[in-house]
Every structure is written in C-alpha cells, then in structure tokens.
C-alpha cells in the first residue's frame, strides 16, 4: 500500500510537469536597467529555484567576503536555522533545523559527499577559504538535488579562475595572511589563476597553525588547535561549444584531539588524530546550449579517512575508518516558454572499511552500498501569478554487509511546491515531499566496538522521509521579509545496538517556523532571522547528546553592514542569540538545562587609496567574552562522572592583510 501511494504521488507530479506544456507564458522581468532592488521574492525565477523564498539559506560570494570565515561556525553565524557545534575543525557538526547535515543531500561542486562517519566526530565540510556560494535547501528538496535528500540539501560551490580574474586580464594571484589571538595563530592562503586560448586554471593553498583556544572564563579547551592543510585545484577548457572542467580538492587536519571530540570527559587526554579528504571530479557541459540540448555529465571520486593511533587496549575511538565514494550523473535541461525541465540519471557506490586494531574478536570489516536513480524536475513561472516546482525520482539501493549478506530494494520520491504572487509585494507558497532514502547506514563507526557476532537484522529496511512547508513572502525594492512553517519527519534510520544493525523504531521530527527580514538603504544593509524548532524522537524531545537530531529551541540573529565609500571602508557586526532550553526528558537523562547566550562579532575593513590591491581587516569574535557552548553541542551532564561541553572560544581578534594582483 505504501508503495502504491508513493507511485500515485510520483505519477501525479510527472503529470503536472507534462501538463504545464499547455499553460500560459512565463511572466517577464520588467525591472528597469540599473535599478537597485533585492532578488525577486517569487520561488521560481528564470527556471531556477529561489531557495531563500521557501525558508532556505543562500550565501553569495559577496556574503562570504564580508564574513571572511575562519571556520563553518563563522560561515553560518548569521543564520538562525543553522547551528554549528564547537571545538576544533574536525569536531564541528552542522545541524539544519536541528537535523545533522548527514540527513541532507550534501554536495561540493555537484559532487555528493559522505555522511558523518562516527557520532563523536564532526560533519564532513569544505574549507570556507575555497567557497564562493552556499545553498541550504531546508525541507522539501528538488529531485535533482541528489539521492537521499531526507531533510533537504546543502550545496557548496568553490571558486574558479573565471570568478577571480579581473576583467581583461589573463593572469592573477591572491595572497591572504592573518594572525589571530586566543590560539587562532597564523593562517595563510595563496592562489594563482589564469586564462589562455580557452584554457583556464586555478591553484589555491590554505593552511592554519595555532594553539588550543580558551573559553570566556579563560579555561584552555583541549584538542582545539587549528591544523588545516588544504589544496584546491581546477582546470577548464572550452572548444567548439564544449566545456570540460576538472577539479581536485585535498583536505588534511592532523593534530592532537580529545578521545571524543564533541564532549569533555573527566581526566580527558589528547591523542594524535588525522582526518583526510580527497575529491576528484570531471564535468562536461555546453557553452552554446540550446533550448532542447543543455547537457551535463559528471564523474567523481571521493575518499575520506579517519586515522587514530592505537592508544589503549580497548575500543574507544582508537580506530581507522576509510570510505570511498564514486559515481556520476547524466542530465539534460529543456527550456520551454514557461520554464525549464531537468531530467537525468545518477549512480554511486560507497565502500566502507573499519579497523579497530583487534580489540575484540573481529578486527576488520568491509561493506558497501550502491545506488542508481532516475529523476526529473520542472520549474515553471506563469503570467497568472502562479509558480510551480515539481519533480520525482525513482531509485534502486543495494547494501552488502560485512558478513556478505545482501539487501536490495527500490522506491519512488516526489516533491512539489506551488506559489501564488498576489502582486509585486506578496507571495504565498506551500510545498511537500515524500522521499525514499534507500539503506541508511548513518554513523557506521559504531561497528568498531562490535564483536564478530554482530550482524544485520534480516528485516533491515530502507529509510523514508516526509516534508511539509508553507509560508508568505513580502518584499519591495529595498526590503524583504518572510515566514516559513516547516515539518520534517524521518523514519527507518539505522540502530547499531549491541547485537545487530536494525532500524530505529522512532520517527524523528523537526517542526516549527522561521522568520527573516532584510532592509537596504544606500550603503547600509540590516538583516535579521529567527527560528523556533521542536525536535522529537517519537513523542519525546531529543536529548542534547550531539546526535543526528538535537534540540535547538529558539535562535535568532541580527546583522548590519555599512559601506563608507569616502574612506574606502566597510564595517559590520553580527549578534547571535539562543534561548534557554529546559525539558523533563533531558533532566531525567541527567542533563543540565542549557542556558541562553548572546554573542557579538564585528569587523572593519579598509582599502588604502595608495595601494588599491591591498585590503586590511580586523575582526573580533565574541566581543563581550561570553562563556558559552554553541547550540547543538553536547550539553553538560552528570553521566560518566560528569560531562562538560566543548566550550566555544572566548574573545578572539583576527588581523588580516590581503593582496590581489
């Protein structure tokens, strides 16, 4: 019955896509040339989704340049819907509306990324120094967002030579150096890029070196020293209307870290840890695409390694984890009078390898998953005020476990978002999706502590998700505002108990609303966001144990940016607030209440008139030296003799100089 209902929904979505061929013409953009306005509030614009219009987040290159983020906490510091837990780089976990990013389809330059490997490590993330754009599509994600988009999608996009080259130039270089107090130490980034005879290339290096930071009370937080060593390389070639792009990203973090990076245990000790990530991809597109022929072909390979030395004679995080993910995508986009339709196939294989140094009766485990899917997504904008984004995909999933037991199944996913624009200032929308997730392995690192008898339950089944959202957008030439109500439910997730891998019986749910507003006046931009979310497992609130689902309660941000062109200056500030969290379930599980906190960051930037290619910047994080731990961190607890959170850094100044040639 469940499959039949899903098939009916998928068929309805596909029929809606086809039926729009009889619809009216798309509404044309009537904005006057040179007029300064915010992005239109409509959910569809020129055949593309407007992520922000449905409660999502978009960070442009200009946004990222303003923030100059040293880590992902600073990258998302202006987004109340996104929480990042504290600690050193490899320990940071990203939660969207209280759901860890592994529940979303995460990609870098279109390449799918692996999920979080172990519940005591951070989310797999890219170096913010390489980014030019980030999109966070919360809730109902499009069918072409990728496989397994249970709670939405996160799309990271890195810079290339064409983004950095000055107009009319064929070669350029950029050097950025900074020094930070409170353990931040030195950070350096260099980039060279060029263009010649249709060939463009870029090479960028970024490294950090520092010490453990101190929290607002002056206590050193172990295992938090910056230790990134990252490389980004890209090349593109255009010929006869064809374009080929090749990209390589290398990430290394090697330092002494806590046994369990997301929590402070009594008598905690640091041990060497290396986290490595390598990604290679090649993509083919057309520069002379037509309405009926706009192809994209992509192949990729990702490798993620977690290595920790054998520091004790039992399983406790001393292990080796290796993942290989490879696959590809073939799609074509059709442009018609009223929008665009994208259709294609994607596929991937994910290999897992674990080594626990022989601290139980099985040292090594190898297992894998495979996926093949077909998808279509249509995005339409009509002159009667309606816009529609709808699509479907069908996937096959296969799981072969460490005992050579094989599980396979297939399922359909469907999504749709419909909006109506009353006038140029008001738009309402509603959307829903039902997503088939295949076999979800989640934090597979659990198996390092399981013995040889550990097996997969024969009834182990694929996961599934449902998303609902609705809202209203308001806007004008210099202001915008919106409210989005959301409800996400995910079931069929894995449960690694002491005897077997099976399905978690609980349905996890995040529901609530987000608010956003922005106003632009001459050289001043003011913005604010607010998020209220209730995250539950079954009927109970989730526990603040740094899991895949975390309580976030009420969170808000307020920011301002001011340009001072007469002095070649820019200044800005961000305020982030999180409300107090207290619930009976957490108290019964020996967690303390989570106190409210308010944190202020600020920056000032200057371009000396005598040296136009130089920028000087000073920034301060946690201006008032608040002693706090970021929401979604492991909360303090009486368990295990007393658990402390990984406290966030106290006041930290950063001084930066940048040259561009």
UniProtKB/Swiss-Prot annotation:
Belongs to the TonB-dependent receptor family. Induction: Induced in absence of iron. Pfam families: Plug, TonB_dep_Rec_b-barrel. Residues 1-23 form the signal peptide. GO terms for molecular function: siderophore uptake transmembrane transporter activity. Residues 48-159 form the TBDR plug domain. Keywords: Cell outer membrane, Membrane, Receptor, Signal, TonB box, Transmembrane, Transmembrane beta strand, Transport. The keyword Cell division does not apply. The keyword Chloroplast does not apply. It comes from Brucella ovis (strain ATCC 25840 / 63/290 / NCTC 10512). Residues 170-661 form the TBDR beta-barrel domain. InterPro entries: Plug_dom, Plug_dom_sf, TonB-dep_rcpt-like, TonB-dep_rcpt_b-brl, TonB_rcpt_b-brl_sf. Heme transporter. This is Heme transporter BhuA.
